[in-house]
């Protein structure tokens, strides 16, 4: 479920040495499955473990995961990186904002998953987002842009050169294109 690099495991062991005996780490997602999802790691003393929690054993400690967070931590990875600028603990959880869908899920569910997990994190840097409104009978994904994308002069390039190209590569034979359903009235919220 969660991968923790050797360097991150060593970092956690060092931190846990200074805690009460049998303290582990808790890995969690606040607001899982939403655009506001945030992942975290905290100390987890023995009396804070709930019966429904799951344990993932590592060298010298366990990662405790609550049942609400578990599906959103699939494929999560924790690493500890050190360089000349210092050191940093990173937690990447690609499914935190949206639960990973099965390969046999509908085309619309799989496209929406790609939009939420791969496309929207990039658009969020400019305050933008995109959602799927429908897939037409001839395989065209109709997309609704919002936030900073609404009124942005670069939306056509983003759609054709970025999003459509990515979706056609991921769903060959299922999708034939992508179109914008958004009314693009320029306003103060627009990125460009």
Swiss-Prot record:
Coiled-coil regions listed: none
Disulphide-bonded residues: none
Keyword Iron-sulfur assigned: yes
Pfam families according to UniProt: Fe-S_biosyn (PF01521), NifU (PF01106)
UniProt cofactor note: Binds 1 [4Fe-4S] cluster per subunit. The cluster is presumably bound at the interface of two monomers.
Keywords assigned by UniProt, alphabetized: 4Fe-4S, Iron, Iron-sulfur, Metal-binding
Keyword Ribosomal protein in annotation: no
Domain of life: Bacteria
Residues engaged in binding [4Fe-4S] cluster: 149, 152
InterPro entries with a match to the protein in the record: Fe/S_biogenesis_protein_NfuA, FeS_biogenesis, FSCA_dom_sf, HesB-like_dom_sf, NIF_FeS_clus_asmbl_NifU_C
Cofactor(s) the protein requires to work: [4Fe-4S] cluster
GO MF terms, alphabetically ordered: 4 iron, 4 sulfur cluster binding; iron ion binding
GO biological process, alphabetically ordered: iron-sulfur cluster assembly; protein maturation
Annotated family: Belongs to the NfuA family.
Protein's job: Involved in iron-sulfur cluster biogenesis. Binds a 4Fe-4S cluster, can transfer this cluster to apoproteins, and thereby intervenes in the maturation of Fe/S proteins. Could also act as a scaffold/chaperone for damaged Fe/S proteins.
Quaternary structure (record): Homodimer.
HAMAP family: Fe_S_biogen_NfuA
Official protein name in the record: Fe/S biogenesis protein NfuA
């Amino acid at each position: 479920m969660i991968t923790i690099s050797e360097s991150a495991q060593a970092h956690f062991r060092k931190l846990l040495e200074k805690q009460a005996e049998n303290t582990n780490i808790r890995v969690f997602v606040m607001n899982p499955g939403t655009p506001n999802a945030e992942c975290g790691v905290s100390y987890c003393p023995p009396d804070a473990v709930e019966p429904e929690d799951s344990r993932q054993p590592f060298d010298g400690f366990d990662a405790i995961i609550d049942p609400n967070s578990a599906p959103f931590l699939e494929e999560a990875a924790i690493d500890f990186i050190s360089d000349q600028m210092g050191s940093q603990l990173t937690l990447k959880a690609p499914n935190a904002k949206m639960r990973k869908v099965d390969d046999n899920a509908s085309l619309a569910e799989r496209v929406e998953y790609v939009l939420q997990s791969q496309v929207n994190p990039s658009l969020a840097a400019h305050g933008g987002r995109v959602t799927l409104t429908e897939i037409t009978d001839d395989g065209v994904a109709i997309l609704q842009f919002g936030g900073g994308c609404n009124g942005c002069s670069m939306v056509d390039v983003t759609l054709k050169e970025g999003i459509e190209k990515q979706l056609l590569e991921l769903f060959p034979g299922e999708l034939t294109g992508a179109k914008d359903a958004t009314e693009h009235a320029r306003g103060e919220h627009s990125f460009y």
